[in-house]
Curated annotation (Swiss-Prot):
SUPFAM superfamilies: Actin-like ATPase domain, Heat shock protein 70kD (HSP70), C-terminal subdomain, Heat shock protein 70kD (HSP70), peptide-binding domain
Basic and acidic residues composition-biased segments: 494-511
Descriptive protein name: Chaperone protein DnaK
Keywords: ATP-binding, Chaperone, Nucleotide-binding, Phosphoprotein, Stress response
A GO molecular-function annotation: ATP-dependent protein folding chaperone
């Protein structure tokens, strides 16, 4: 049975994990790191870069590098590059494709099934869009799981059968969630969840950038916000400074040649940022985490003292001010230090994948819907059918009637949110039930059913009890992608994957050819410069020279078939040269007699050993 992976598709970084012998293992990417930057870049030569390579070139390719796209998923945002619009789903799919490739390389087998995590406070549109991204990447998304739930699963599965209350405080690169869960006897049940989908480490970075811009403007009079390349350098420096301030009391931010003045003289940015100043300029961001925390405690109906464990998730929780605030809000409870905040979500996703595949037994995951769901009724009121923090999957029905006499149809508008007025909530979608027989208002019986699956994705049905007519909508308005569009994007992604594969193959062929040319050229030169002259006739060397010239000419062009052909020809000629040298050496030894032959052979052998060692050492240094 093919294995399934667990993927934490993050705003800043993403992680993939898999079960090995029943235990979750975080898979290192092709660059050797356990986390992959969620960055996608479109190079000028048509190559699509993902992860660290994309992040590395961001300064010189600002307009064609996309980061933190998770903040836009489930919206109609898009970016135009080379005349083509890319949706958040397509950009996210690039990151997922890289994680998929890295997992396949690690396991040595194809991967098709995956569990992907999302912030607990993601609405239906964002969940559907994440699932679409997985589909575009060639993955069968077994389940969409809430990040705090996955973290609790990873943390609590080995904590015995005693029931425990766990608070998960998840502050990532772009989103914030806080969830309260009960864990015991293999059951992970979410009691309540809340959050903010636009609060994360990126916001802390932005505050440092703003601080640097103000400081630089104050000393030089130049506004760096008008310089895209300078702003990208500031963002990277801000992220680095934020990380350093997690372990140091102050950090130096030094950016030479950040811009030039009116006389084209280079200007430098050199500032010292202290942890206290950093905390001062970001205090309001920190305070925004208080309300969701209080909401979760209230919704779960418990006191802070009943929390057994506090688990911090997301790289942003490494900031001392964050862990101190959590400690304060939980009545002095020390957050658990036994989990890696960057990896625990992917580990939990891998465990859930194992549950769905039957590899992990006796585990039941009971998640909740983060926001209430309902329809708009007369007067623009939001009538809730499913309250927030209801365990999913779930199904609820309620009967409504018409507002006017002889009303032939009803418009069902589906909303998600907590406001009493429907228009103040998030409109997920709408559909119409037609063919209602003429009748006075209040007589027709329209049954509306909400069905939420285990992924948190909503299906709504409206049925006229009198006629049996019904209409159903699967909410995907927020994702904005039809099946045809998803299919097209899958084909595009596959085409790009083929292009990338072809480009890699071409690079490999070119590298092999260049290496063969260099080694053969060097060998021929050594033969001509050898004491006593070459051991082989000049016409043999001339043939090799010609093959080298042909290979160089092919390398100057773009025809890979020509390079392969020239490389094969050069390989044949260099083999013939090697054979000729071997035969000449044997003939010399036979003519020179045993003692002389042995002496010459020993000397050559010694030289060969020394050369080999030097080459190996040199390669290691590289």
């Amino acid at each position: 049975m093919a294995r399934a992976v667990g993927i934490d598709l993050g705003t800043t970084n993403s992680v993939v994990a898999v079960l090995e012998g029943g235990d979750p293992v975080v898979v290192a990417n092709s660059e050797g790191s356990r986390t992959t930057p969620s960055v996608v870049a479109f190079a000028r030569n048509g190559e699509v870069l993902v992860g660290q390579p994309a992040k590395n070139q961001a300064v010189t390719n600002v307009d064609r590098t996309i980061r933190s796209v998770k903040r836009e998923i489930g919206t109609d945002w898009s970016v135009e590059i080379d005349g083509k619009n890319y949706t958040p789903q397509e950009i996210s799919a690039r990151v997922l494709m890289k994680l998929k490739r890295d997992a396949e390389s690690y396991l040595g087998e194809d991967i098709t099934d995956a569990v992907i995590t999302v912030p607990a406070y993601f609405n239906d549109a964002q969940r559907q869009a994440t699932k679409d991204a997985g589909q575009i990447a060639g993955l069968n998304v077994l389940r969409i799981v809430n990040e705090p739930t996955a973290a609790a699963l990873a943390y609590g599965l080995d904590k015995g059968e005693k029931e425990q209350t766990i608070l998960v405080f998840d502050l990532g690169g772009g989103t914030f969630d806080v969830s309260l869960l009960e864990i015991g006897e293999g059951v992970v049940e979410v009691r309540a969840t809340s959050g903010d989908n636009h609060l994360g480490g990126d916001d802390w970075d932005d505050r440092i950038v703003e601080w640097l811009v103000d400081k630089f403007k104050g000393t030089s009079g130049i506004d760096l916000t008008k310089d895209k390349m300078a702003m990208q350098r500031l963002r990277e420096a801000a992220e680095k400074a934020k990380i350093e301030l997690s372990s140091s009391q102050s950090t130096s931010i030094n950016l030479p040649y950040i811009t030039v003045d009116a006389d084209k003289n280079p200007l430098f940015l050199d500032e010292q940022l202290t942890r206290s100043e950093f905390q001062k300029i970001t205090q309001d961001l920190l305070d925004r985490t208080r309300k969701p925390f209080q909401s979760v405690i209230k919704d779960a109906g418990i006191s802070v003292g009943e929390i057994d464990h506090v688990v911090l998730v997301g790289g942003s929780t490494r900031m001392p001010a964050v862990s101190e605030l959590v400690k304060e809000m939980t009545g002095g409870k020390e957050p658990n230090k036994g989990v890696n905040p960057d990896e625990v979500v992917a580990v939990g996703a891998a465990l859930q994948a194992g549950v769905l595949k039957g590899e992990v037994k006796d585990v039941l995951l009971l998640d909740v819907t983060p926001l209430s769901l309902g329809i708009e009724t007369k007067g623009g009121v939001m009538t809730k059918l499913i309250e927030r923090n209801t365990t999913i999957p779930t199904k609820r029905s309620e009967t409504f009637t018409t507002a006017d006499d002889n009303q032939p149809s009803v418009q069902i508008q589906v909303f998600q949110g907590e406001r009493e007025i429907a228009s103040h909530n998030k409109l997920l979608g709408s559909f119409e039930l037609t063919g209602i027989p003429p009748a006075p208002r209040g007589v027709p019986q329209i049954e509306v059913t909400f069905d939420i699956d285990a992924n948190g994705i909503v299906h709504v049905t409206a049925k006229d009890k009198g006629t049996g007519k019904e209409n159903t909508i699967k909410i995907q308005e927020g994702s904005g992608l039809s099946k045809e569009e998803i299919d097209r994007m899958i084909k595009d992604a596959e085409a790009h994957a083929d292009e990338d594969r072809k480009r890699r193959e071409e690079a490999d062929v070119r590298n092999q050819a260049e290496s063969l040319v260099y080694q053969t050229e060097k060998f021929v030169k050594e033969q001509r410069e050898a004491e006593g002259g070459s051991k082989v006739p000049e016409d043999t060397l001339t043939k090799v020279d010609a093959a080298i010239s042909d290979a160089k000419a092919a390398l100057a062009g773009t025809d890979i078939a020509a390079i392969k052909s020239a490389m094969e020809k050069l390989g044949e000629e260099s083999q013939a040269l090697g054979q000729a040298i071997y035969e000449a050496t044997q003939a010399e030894q036979a003519a020179g007699g045993a003692p002389g032959g042995e002496s010459t052979g020993a000397s050559n052998s010694g030289d060969d050993v020394v050369d080999a060692e030097v080459v190996e050492d040199d390669q290691e240094r590289k």
